[in-house]
């Protein structure tokens, strides 16, 4: 049977179509080619994005019109480290649910937040955490968005964060705090006079050294020496990571390495050293647990690169969040001297000044020193590390506060809004640790809309580690030294992975108590 020539629109045959396309290509100048590229790959996709956003149910949610069609306001705020203030201002103006950007909303209602992060345990947002990875296909525990894969990784690492194991790290934590005490003793050489120190640098150095000795088997000696390349590079990396969560195109910049070369070499070398020491040297730190479960065979879910990435997250996130919580706690106490006086009385009750050489012991005092815990909890209520909450994703069409939420929408369960809800907390913006003593007495801590470590299956695995470190550090420092407030300090915060001071320095006066 005779074949029929393939027909095209407008009756063009194959050879005719090829000829016309060839003529069009010949007529293209560089300017026209660039123009065509812009139209095809920039303008047309933007038009489709605009139309999709125009007809999305998200446009019915309160918020500025520009936020519903452009990510720029949120991206600019994120780049400046002000996304938490950006969201706070929107909630104050528009209410408990607001649009942050196309496909992204923030919810400030405590009941809906609990539903999202705890009762229904929504998955983490792929739009956010998909960009928080050194290797897109191999996320860390923090950045998993698929529940089953996350559960497997969590089971693999769970023994590292149990109470029993965390307690075994107490001597290592104490060694760092002792080094910090020795350093302050040198600075306070005149017992009758106070000395001005950079409290921010000191507490961050102490936290970094603690994570170093418990994770990598050795202190970085930041407190004594003032700095170390690894934590400095990690801090810079955290700023980039915070921006990349929302401004993902940065990762497509040519020749931009996936990992900082210094961090890559440092972590690879230390893992390699551990393997060579296997059996000969016994290590009891967190890194050894990672190395023990590492397997580089084909198909392995936990390779050497995963050990490197998890150890970096432990160091960066662990030191940063704990240090900020400690720092803000001390700042709040310095600004409220009557609270500081009350806490010192509790410290002296458990560790009498007549026993200066007695070691601080968590097993002895952590659960009993309720006012210290109240001071920490009240600080984290007012200044939560995860200010805008851990972003989740609607895996199906949902309804929040009566508004339809399309599948795939990123939802920020806004922690700071719940923590400052005047219908739940009396005088919500005031520092009142005593409110927690009543909550503890009624055994209602878990019932409160209070999520500094998130909740549900994605609750921070390092919670017990952080509380133990803070208890040892703060109790020991308040036993040995008196801290005095220096007026005029910049207390503005920025939000980059964790809420932190914008300034690089926070000065206080310190002197020996005895």
Swiss-Prot record:
Glycans are attached at residues 225, 443. Its main location: membrane. The keyword Transferase does not apply. It is a single-pass membrane protein. It is found in: Membrane. Its EC number is 1.-.-.-. Its cofactor is heme. One of its GO terms (cellular component) is membrane. SUPFAM superfamilies: Cytochrome P450 (SSF48264). Heme binds at residue 460. One of its GO terms (molecular function) is oxidoreductase activity, acting on paired donors, with incorporation or reduction of molecular oxygen. The chain crosses the membrane at residues 28-48. Keywords: Glycoprotein, Heme, Iron, Membrane, Metal-binding, Monooxygenase, Oxidoreductase, Transmembrane, Transmembrane helix. Pathway: Mycotoxin biosynthesis. It holds the Pfam family p450. PANTHER family: CYTOCHROME P450, CYTOCHROME P450 12A4, MITOCHONDRIAL-RELATED. Cytochrome P450 monooxygenase; part of the gene cluster that mediates the biosynthesis of the mycotoxin fusarin C. Within the cluster, FUS1, FUS2, FUS8 and FUS9 are sufficient for fusarin production. The roles of the other FUS members are yet undetermined. The fusarin C synthetase FUS1 is responsible for the condensation of one acetyl-coenzyme A (CoA) unit with six malonyl-CoA units and the amide linkage of the arising heptaketide and homoserine, subsequently releasing the first intermediate, prefusarin, as an alcohol with an open ring structure. Belongs to the cytochrome P450 family. This is Cytochrome P450 monooxygenase FUS8. The gene is FUS8.
